[in-house]
């Protein structure tokens, strides 16, 4: 029988024998095999019995044959339904609507304690409902405590008083020389300045570069800052007291609050000044729709309750200032005042770019509260580099408040190219914008807020169980949106986005791979136009990339590592002998836009935008690689992979895998478009060398030894975002790579690392929950309070982190974190397959969801854009659902087959290359049975508009059989090493760990088994890294069902009671009903324990789980029974290493996954007794404290504590 080829099978035919309920848990499906048997049984039926039956069977045969042909076509691509570990068959049904996720109030409340693990959160706050971040601490100016405003074109970092320009004056860690500086390459003093998109200067030399010799062949390009447009100041009593960032001291300020609304991008600052006599409130915003408009609102009022008895009036001079000294790397073109319009203006040019300038035009309205009469400026000043208007007002008890609205038009040459009135000068347009806005504050504010609200209607992420993660998702969206725009972007220039956006000159404001690989993909599913604008910048600089290749004698094109105004090869951005992978990154970003397929992205885009970039990159790499006749493979040389700790190496793994993948893209796209395809591309793609150790661990580069410390994700990038895996052998190697390199990341490395591990773990591991522990590891060490901005480093102290002054804010991390949710936890990937007959590319969406035990209730991605359709992606506790909510075109979805994954089949080194140790780390797994057939493909679906596809979530197995603690909630009661998170100790991954900050003091982890899930611990195991502890103790909090019920009910009562009297009465009745006596005492006689330490543990527990309850206990003595003491069931058990130390590891020649040390223990309850003799109910517990102290080898210079990889507790 001739097989009919069809890439997509018919959705209706696919589910004729399935239960169409959207809930798939515990549903049975007969599968393809049973349907094949039915077909064969029909074909053997005796047709002679009845002519009528013959006719009926004839018709039925036609129908069944059609089904069989469709089935055969499917089987060409997938036998995934035969996998015993996971049934990927889904149900397509009419859309059920919004899919509200379950809300777990206890998990949500507990998650709020995670904020306290953020750096500098002690005086910060977050209003969840209104999305407001803020601080009550008036501090000296330091970058991490400053918010900013931006709209994708203009931006300004806001100092402590709420407006103006300020240099940093505080470093938390040291006052060493350079402590207040930014990092490479400028190494200049950090400042709260103002910036304009694409306003680049040219510098003959920079303070720090990688290739200074290239300064002789081309200037470097870095961002210039413009005069600070938020600069308002006021002075009192003949200018004897000034209110500006330079003159306001810590002692002058009380009742301080500064907050950032992520709903609308407004920064509000309020404070009392001068013995609380004056109240100052400011609001700053960059108009979301009118990009060249910045607005400052300032209210100055008398606090009448704090005025002296002889107070009469207060003279105030308000200064609207433009000061050239607040800009950097610019030349002053002109400055002046416009007395007719009460305005000041200034024009600056970026250094060495006379063809560009930026004009700033500022005008104010000044009115008393409840007055309609504006006050005109009384004086104007024009100095050499400062222009100002002065408004004199008198505050009295009858007129106690003055309101200033400052409207600033900002126009640069780069933005003016997009305007219809291109003949207008920049100053003319800036003036028009400011004057048209003047006096329309409320109307402008309303339109500004509406523009922000409209943006959020296009994108939303829900994580109901975790306030911190949801806030981080929201803040990441906010920060990326604040620094990009989807219109008013020149198509022939695009949108260059620097690492720190529009509020900082970190990394010189230059464009790195951060824009292509980290930020753009995070925006693409929600804001494809913004992503395309960012990619258009690479299109605009493509012609220069071709000149770069020509300069070095290569065909094709070579992008430099850094770009700005131009994309020439510079000392910061060399084109050769450095990070060649940038060419893969740019190509991947462009191809991803095609695979996403938003409006207008079709074969024309592929032919005229993506194809030239990929073709030229393929041409360059074809000439660059060298054939090694001894290996019979192609090699690369003298390069740097993403791990910048290793420079000038050969055969970088990610670079070579990128070349392999890119050459495949070039072949596939060329064939699809009917273009000429170089046969050499396929040959090199097939035969490029990826270095591996004898144990099949991918080496980051040729000659790598085991002493390596990795700066950032490198080899793991082959899994995501590159998608290098294309057969089972590579998949198995990738799993080993994930394990190996997870233990070799620098503790102080950049925040772009662990989002990649989230995606890799979710896609590669069938056990544990490390995809979620990596998610926390992506946030907790890097996110900075109070304004939820990411730092580049987990440790901001340049004296302890390798002399790195972190970029801030680090938008790269915002993009990475969003990708870890959008693509990591959901398993979503843009993908394609090639029809083997026509060579045509067919775009599809891969969906590979897993259960998320650390995130009860799941996650929801609202308004995901794909193929110009709008989707909701829902991961709840049992099912994954894609809802086709808007659009009129079906989409193609593929569910991969996870039966290929063998994440436990790891053989460990045993001191000999020829003998492998039996798998000591092999974790017990409950297998239903081995898969009937390995299949690298999956199951395909066609999802039509107003339908939804629901698939059963893959349920990862337990790492260790019957481990009651795995995937449960955990918190560290003592400090850990920067970059470590406690979740790693229970995540079912033997290659993640938590490590105490020091080895001297006792370190503690507190585990919560969950509500109504108390267990009696009988035995367990601690899996150590190469650094075991000296001893271990375990304590439990004796618990009972009565206590559990009271615990939950008291919390509910607290949330619903309206006043203290009602609260006390209700709790009293609850305790009476439960039989709790007025004087409730629990007998702990006979138990030797450290009372103070036990009480501290209880206090920590209450603070973690129920902070309000801890306060309530102090008010209601009868609740003291909840302060049960922890009972020590394992006391200072000494630890002995279970594994030898291999000499090959010491001499750095060993590239192996080493077996871990372990300590097993059993609990002897006969030596313990609590309460009445014979009573064993106390042994059950929900809360456990695991304490470790010291390290086994206490003679090294490392002050950090033991490495705890996994805690296993059995009942």
UniProtKB/Swiss-Prot annotation:
Q: Identify the Pfam families for this entry.
A: Glyco_hydro_65C (PF03633), Glyco_hydro_65m (PF03632), Glyco_hydro_65N (PF03636)
Question: Transmembrane stretches, by residue range?
Answer: 47-67
Q: Name one GO biological process term.
A: carbon utilization
Give the record's PTM text: Glycosylated.
- Which residues are substrate-binding? 513-514, 711-712
A Gene Ontology cellular component where this protein is annotated is: cell periphery
* Annotated active site: 644 (proton donor)
**Membrane-side (Periplasmic) residue stretches:** 68-1211
Q: What are the glycosylated positions?
A: 98, 207, 238, 247, 255, 259, 325, 370, 376, 488, 539, 568, 628, 638, 696, 705, 879, 897, 910, 972, 990, 1031, 1049, 1064, 1147, 1157
Transmembrane is among the record's keywords = yes
- The domain of life is Eukaryota
What is the deletion mutant like? Abolishes cellular acid trehalase activity. Abolishes growth on trehalose carbon source.
Which reaction is catalysed here?
A: alpha,alpha-trehalose + H2O = alpha-D-glucose + beta-D-glucose
Q: Record keywords: Thylakoid included?
A: no
Q: Which residue intervals make up region (Required for cell surface targeting)?
A: 70-131
Q: How does it sit in the membrane?
A: Single-pass type II membrane protein
Q: Which UniProt keywords apply?
A: Glycoprotein, Glycosidase, Hydrolase, Membrane, Periplasm, Signal-anchor, Transmembrane, Transmembrane helix, Ubl conjugation, Vacuole
Which sequence ranges are listed under topological domain Cytoplasmic?
1-46
Question: Hey, which family's this protein in?
Answer: Belongs to the glycosyl hydrolase 65 family.
Role played:
Periplasmic acid trehalase that catalyzes hydrolysis of the disaccharide trehalose and required for growth on trehalose as carbon source. Growth on trehalose is strictly respiratory.
What is the name attached to this protein's record? Periplasmic acid trehalase ATH1
Q: Which organism is it from?
A: Saccharomyces cerevisiae (strain ATCC 204508 / S288c)
Gene transcribed to yield this protein: ATH1
């Amino acid at each position: 029988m001739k097989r009919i080829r069809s890439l997509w099978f018919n959705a209706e035919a696919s589910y004729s024998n399935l239960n169409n309920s959207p809930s798939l848990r515990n549903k049975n499906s007969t599968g393809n095999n049973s349907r094949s048997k039915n077909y064969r049984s029909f074909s053997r039926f005796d047709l002679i019995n009845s002519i009528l039956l013959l006719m009926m069977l004839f018709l039925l045969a036609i129908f069944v044959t059609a089904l069989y042909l469709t089935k055969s076509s499917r089987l060409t691509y997938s036998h995934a339904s035969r996998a015993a570990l996971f049934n990927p068959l889904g149900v397509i049904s009419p859309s059920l609507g919004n899919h509200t996720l379950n809300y777990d109030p206890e998990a949500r409340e507990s998650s709020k304690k995670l904020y306290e693990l953020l750096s500098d959160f002690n005086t910060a706050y977050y209003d969840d409902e209104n999305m407001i971040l803020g601080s009550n601490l008036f501090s000296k100016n330091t970058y991490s405590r400053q918010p900013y405003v931006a709209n994708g074109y203009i931006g300004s970092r806001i100092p402590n008083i709420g407006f103006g320009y300020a240099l940093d004056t505080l470093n938390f860690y040291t006052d060493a020389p350079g402590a207040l500086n930014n990092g490479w390459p400028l190494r200049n003093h950090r400042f709260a300045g103002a910036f304009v998109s694409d306003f680049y200067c040219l510098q003959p030399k920079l303070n720090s570069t990688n290739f200074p010799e290239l300064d002789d062949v081309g200037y470097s390009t870095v961002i210039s800052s413009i005069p600070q447009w938020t600069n308002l100041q006021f002075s009192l009593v003949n200018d004897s007291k000034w209110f500006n960032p330079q003159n306001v001291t810590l002692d002058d300020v009380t009742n301080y609050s500064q907050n950032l609304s992520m709903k609308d991008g407004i920064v509000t600052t309020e404070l009392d000044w001068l013995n609380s006599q004056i109240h100052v409130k400011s609001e700053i915003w960059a108009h979301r729709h009118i990009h060249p408009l910045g607005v400052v609102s300032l209210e100055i009022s008398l606090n009448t309750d704090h005025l002296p008895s002889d107070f009469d009036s207060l003279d105030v001079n308000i200064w609207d200032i433009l000061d050239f000294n607040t800009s950097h790397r610019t030349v002053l073109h002109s400055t002046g005042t416009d007395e007719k319009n009460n305005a000041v203006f200034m024009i600056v040019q970026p250094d060495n770019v006379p063809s560009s300038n930026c004009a700033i035009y500022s005008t104010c309205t000044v009115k008393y509260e409840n007055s309609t009469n504006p006050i005109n400026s009384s004086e104007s000043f024009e100095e050499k580099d400062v222009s100002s208007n002065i408004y004199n007002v008198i505050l009295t008890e009858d007129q106690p408040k003055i309101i200033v609205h400052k409207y600033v038009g900002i126009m640069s040459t780069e933005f003016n190219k997009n305007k219809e009135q291109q003949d207008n000068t920049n100053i003319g347009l800036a003036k028009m914008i400011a004057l048209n806005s003047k006096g329309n504050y409320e109307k402008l504010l309303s339109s500004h807020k509406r523009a922000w609200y409209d943006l959020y209607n296009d994108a939303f992420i829900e994580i109901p169980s975790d306030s911190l993660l949801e806030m981080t998702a929201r803040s990441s969206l906010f920060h990326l949106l604040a620094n990009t725009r989807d219109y008013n972007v020149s198509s022939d220039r695009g949108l260059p986005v620097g690492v720190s956006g529009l509020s900082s000159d970190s990394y010189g404001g230059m464009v790195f791979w951060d824009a292509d690989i980290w930020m753009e993909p995070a925006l693409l599913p929600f804001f494809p136009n913004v992503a395309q604008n960012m990619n258009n910048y690479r299109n605009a600089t493509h012609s220069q990339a071709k000149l770069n290749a020509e300069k070095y004698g290569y065909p094709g094109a070579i992008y430099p590592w850094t770009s700005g105004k131009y994309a020439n090869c510079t000392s910061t951005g060399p084109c050769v002998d450095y990070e060649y992978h940038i060419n893969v990154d740019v190509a991947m970003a462009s191809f991803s836009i095609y695979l996403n397929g938003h409006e207008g992205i079709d074969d024309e885009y592929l032919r005229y935008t993506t194809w030239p970039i990929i073709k030229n990159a393929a041409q360059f790499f074809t000439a660059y690689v060298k054939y090694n006749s001894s290996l019979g493979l192609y090699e690369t040389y003298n390069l740097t992979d993403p791990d910048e700790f290793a420079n000038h190496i050969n055969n970088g793994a990610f670079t070579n895998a990128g070349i392999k993948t890119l050459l495949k893209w070039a072949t596939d796209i060329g064939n699809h478009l009917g273009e000429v395809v170089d046969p050499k591309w396929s040959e090199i793609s097939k035969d490029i060398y990826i270095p591996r150790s004898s144990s099949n661990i991918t080496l980051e580069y040729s000659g790598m030894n085991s002493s390596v410390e990795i700066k950032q994700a490198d080899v793991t990038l082959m899994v995501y975002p590159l998608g290098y895996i294309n057969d089972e052998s590579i998949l198995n190697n990738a799993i080993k790579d994930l394990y190996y390199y997870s233990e070799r990341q620098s503790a102080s490395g950049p925040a772009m690392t662990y989002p990649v591990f989230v995606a890799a773990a979710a896609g590669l591991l069938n056990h544990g929950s490390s995809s979620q522990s990596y998610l926390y590891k992506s946030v907790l060490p890097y996110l900075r309070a109070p304004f939820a901005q990411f730092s580049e480093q987990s440790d901001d102290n340049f004296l302890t982190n390798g002399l790195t002054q972190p970029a801030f804010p680090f938008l790269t991390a915002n993009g990475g974190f969003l990708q870890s949710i959008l693509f990591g936890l959901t398993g979503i990937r843009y993908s394609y397959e090639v029809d083997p007959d026509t060579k045509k590319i067919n775009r599809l969406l891969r969906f590979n969801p897993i259960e998320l035990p650390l995130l009860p209730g799941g996650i929801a991605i609202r308004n995901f854009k794909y193929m110009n359709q709008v989707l909701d992606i829902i991961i709840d506790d049992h099912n994954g659902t894609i809802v086709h909510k808007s659009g009129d075109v079906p989409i193609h979805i593929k569910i991969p087959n996870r039966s290929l994954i063998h994440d436990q089949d790891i053989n460990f080194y045993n001191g000999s290359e020829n003998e492998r140790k039996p798998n000591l780390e092999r974790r017990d797994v409950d297998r239903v049975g081995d898969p009937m057939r390995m299949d690298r493909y999956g199951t395909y679906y066609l999802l039509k508009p107003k339908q939804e596809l629901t698939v059963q979530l893959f349920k990862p197995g337990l790492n260790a059989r019957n481990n009651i603690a795995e995937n449960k909630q955990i918190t560290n009661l003592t400090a850990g090493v920067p970059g470590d998170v406690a979740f790693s100790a229970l995540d079912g991954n033997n290659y993640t760990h938590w490590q105490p900050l020091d080895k001297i003091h006792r370190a503690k982890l507190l585990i919560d088994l969950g509500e109504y899930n108390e267990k009696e611990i009988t035995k367990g195991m601690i899996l150590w890294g190469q650094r075991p502890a000296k001893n271990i103790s375990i304590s439990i909090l004796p618990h009972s069902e009565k206590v559990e019920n009271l615990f939950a009910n008291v919390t509910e009562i607290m949330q619903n009671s309206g006043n203290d009297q009602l609260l006390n009465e209700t709790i009293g009745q609850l305790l009476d009903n439960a039989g709790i006596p007025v004087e409730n005492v629990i007998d702990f006689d006979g138990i030797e324990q450290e009372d103070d330490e036990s009480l501290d543990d209880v206090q920590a527990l209450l603070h973690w789980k129920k902070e309000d309850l801890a306060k309530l206990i102090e008010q209601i003595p009868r609740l003291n029974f909840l302060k049960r003491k922890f009972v020590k069931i394992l006391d200072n058990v000494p630890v002995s290493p279970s594994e030898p130390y291999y000499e090959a590891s010491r001499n750095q020649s060993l590239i192996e996954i080493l077996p871990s040390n372990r300590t097993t223990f059993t609990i002897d309850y006969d030596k313990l007794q609590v309460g009445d003799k014979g009573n064993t109910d106390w042994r059950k517990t929900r809360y456990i404290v695991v304490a470790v102290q010291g390290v086994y080898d206490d003679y090294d210079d490392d002050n950090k504590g033991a490495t705890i990889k996994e805690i296993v507790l059995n009942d």
